[in-house]
Structures are given as C-alpha cells and as structure tokens.
C-alpha cells in the first residue's frame, strides 16, 4: 500500500485527496504523475521521521522527474534529511545541486549558512579562530544571498550579520 494511503492525520489525508484530484485533472504524463506520487510519499515519510523511506521515495522521484524546477525541491528535501542526520557535507552537496536547478531557493541558502555557522562554532570550540572566520564569512555570504531573495525573512541572520560587521555586501 502506498504511503499516501496510510496517512493518519486529517491534514495529510486532505492534501493527499486534493493532490490525487489535481493529478487526474491536470494534463500530465504518467511518468510525471509517478514522480509526484513518490515526491509526496517522500514528504510524508520525512515529516514522520522515516528518513530511509523518504530517501527511497525521493531517489525514485529524481529518477522519474525531468523538470529542473521540480528536481530542485526533491534535491532540497534530500539535503534536509542529510542535515537532520548530521551529514553536513552531503547536505551541502544536495543544496548546491538544488540551487543549480533553481537559484531562487532562499531556504537552501539559509540552510547552507546554518551549516557553515555551525562549523564556525565548532572551530571556536577547537581553538581554531582562522578556520572559524572562514566558516563565518561563508555563512555570511549565503545569508546575504538568502536575504536578497527573501528580504523579510531570516531576521536572526540579519541581526547576526549586523552584530558581526558582516552585513555589507562585498
């Protein structure tokens, strides 16, 4: 039984029903419908913390999906899972791939900045101020790009940029 038929909560069930209706109405190929079904099942599994199942669905969606814009969101979600699992290098790779296909993903840039900031914090704990500055500068670059795409978002990042003197665009 597909995951989409196992949804227990009202919102997921409603979303699934609406998505199924739209898939029937909108003229798309069978391949596109299958890709969307795997993407939707991946999101459902991911929201329940079933990351292995989510990844299987996302990889299958990637195999089927040909639209770069749609692929960007699949790649972004794969990046989220790797971030949640603490696999930051892998997560960064997927965020980069998502941005290559869709440069208007401020959430990917924000997540990349958060990872770089975290690595900067780790460098502080390890007593390596030079490496810390490199990571913080990289985080600042990503946050500035994210903020330029979504100026009313990322208020904490905007404050951090001001406080650390990194708010000026290079």
UniProtKB/Swiss-Prot annotation:
Bilayer topology annotation: Peripheral membrane protein
TPR repeats: 35-68, 72-105, 120-153
Subcellular localization(s) per the UniProt record: Plastid, Chloroplast thylakoid membrane
A single cellular component GO annotation: chloroplast thylakoid membrane
InterPro entries: PSI_Ycf3_assembly (IPR022818), TPR-like_helical_dom_sf (IPR011990), TPR_rpt (IPR019734)
Principal subcellular localization: plastid
Highest taxon, organism lineage: Eukaryota
GO BP, one annotated term: photosynthesis
Keyword ATP-binding: no
Keywords, ordered alphabetically: Chloroplast, Membrane, Photosynthesis, Plastid, Repeat, Thylakoid, TPR repeat
Protein role: Essential for the assembly of the photosystem I (PSI) complex. May act as a chaperone-like factor to guide the assembly of the PSI subunits.
NCBIfam families attached to this UniProt entry: PRK02603.1
Family: Belongs to the Ycf3 family.
Protein name according to UniProt: Photosystem I assembly protein Ycf3
Source organism of the structure: Anthoceros angustus
